[in-house]
Amino acid sequence: KEKVYWFIRNNSRNAFKDQRILLKNLESGIILDVGAHIGNTVKLYRNYFPGYKIFCIEPFSESCDYLKKRFINASNINIVEIALGSKDETKTLFVSNFSNLNSLQRPNERAWGFADKKSVDVKTTTLDQFCYDNDIKHIDILKLDVQGSELDVLMGSKKIFEKGNISLV
């Protein structure tokens, strides 16, 4: 624990390089980008971890369509149109004027940019169930950017965390 803190405090200049070093430069593995949006982070992960299988998890269909076009020739990238949460259910996704602010949490309409323009129902599942369905035994990197629903995702990840099968969050 102290070594990781020392490493981050003294060497962190590029989060992707740091993750590569912390994973001991393994040539293959699994990355889950939960809240992939339009794939900007996926593109960076693809550059730094070319041998890894990357799952883009995104509930907004328009973003998924864009991701499919953007990574059409990337055989190591899987786009999955679903939201992760604490249980399997249907939830409301509040769609903002700015798609990077879409959220399962009701927006504060007085906050800048957070007024929703529409809402859509989306299917949610747990990270544990997602891993089971996709035969994922270990996650090397779990990236979460889900606009306030991070705790819900973690609540649905109890089994994989209890087994110690996630390297980096």
Describe each model-derived feature in a short phrase.
Residues 1-168:
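Phosphate/nucleotide-binding beta-alpha loop and adjacent structural elements of enzyme active sites
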